[in-house]
Amino acid sequence: MNQSSAKGSGGRRSLWSQARELSQLAPPERNRWVDFLRALSILAVVFGHWLVAAPYIDEAGAVQGGHLLGILPWSQWLTWGFQVMPIFFLVGGYSNGVSWSARLRKAEPGQKGVYRDWFASRVQRLITPVFPVLLLWAALAFAMTMAGMDRDNVKMATQLALVPVWFLAVYLLVTAITPLSLKLWKKFGWLSFLGLVLGAWAIDYLTLLQNVPYVNFANFLFVWVGIHQLGYAWQDGRIGGGVAVMLLAVGLAALVWLTVFGPYPIAMIGVPGAEITNSMPPTIALLALGVTQTGLVLTLEPWGRKLLDNLALWTATVLMNGMIMTVYLWHLTAFVLVMVLAWLAGGIGLEMYPGTAEWWWTRPIWIAVYILALLPMIAVFARAERVFGPIRGGRTVPKLRVVLGVLAICIGLAMTAAISIASPEGLTGVRLWVVALPFVGAALMGFGPVYVWFKREPAEAA
């Protein structure tokens, strides 16, 4: 959706009035359900994280990093509703298919660098909001280390706050192969999806039954590209009412068979102490959940699109999509801030053991506090989703630089989530190479995060 810089008195308009104006400019052919599902999926993940993370103070007065799914096994069923990253990848397939097809239509015959420019622009819009949170936590990790804090605690706080960046590394790789995956869909249709399902099943077979090490990481592509492929089917009009209901039924049956009667855990995210995780790396069970959720949300699509004809609801959707990556990237920072303040205040609210009646009744209060802590972060950092610097002054970025750049970004983000930017040794207490990789990747791809942040006039945003 297009948005431009507010000038003069327009700069003083409320965010709601700006979103309302943008919502009224949306073309009538736009599928508003896509935007709604994008916002819904991220918000579900945010509230799921706030609910699952359950630190408390034990009888000895020590803070324990409680995990609700480990404390209350029945709560693992809740992840079937809160683990909605598959919906984000479904929406990503729809959006990337539309965007890439439009870019091809606009390209002149024989024009070079079409893919490189398209992909560099997509990367820039996704990675720019990461830079502020990454820099802040690098500075905090350094400051906490210099203050003499236990390095394990520094690592725990830093890793908890930054773990959401894992999905960006995967999503960038999935987006990178959009031209290939879309071409496969156009040529083979549903067979292109079935091939990925069989590939995910084969990886799980090698992992669980043959004990082949490391091969399970291939499912980051098989599973997520498979769900991304369903987005093409949706955009192509191949998932109508009957097909959507069939996907819902088949996906749910497979999910129950794999988890209730099969070897896979009920939880769709990692549970402390569990031998198998459905998300890191993903399994065929998570793919079954993705098919189930696809069938559900597309069965509801006609009702949802009619509902979004309501201007207030559509404006709220536009407003949320304008800050959605900021909400996602900063929500655990807000959580850590609240926990630290509660601890400094004598452990107020942390004396309740997770899962008790008292703990459940106080969840709405805690979530309200998390939202209040998040609001200033949105106010300061959401602009990173709306301002973009030029990519090499409009010149095409060389192919090798694009490849090296995206690899550096993805490796940096993956390491941030996997091993943390906090270092157990060294003078600074920070893994500087991990922090630097996304910035190096951005520079290689031709856009500078510092320039972007201080740029006053927002460029056109998708």
Predicted regions span which residues?
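Alpha-helical transmembrane segments and their immediate juxtamembrane cytosolic regions
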Residues: N2, K7-A462
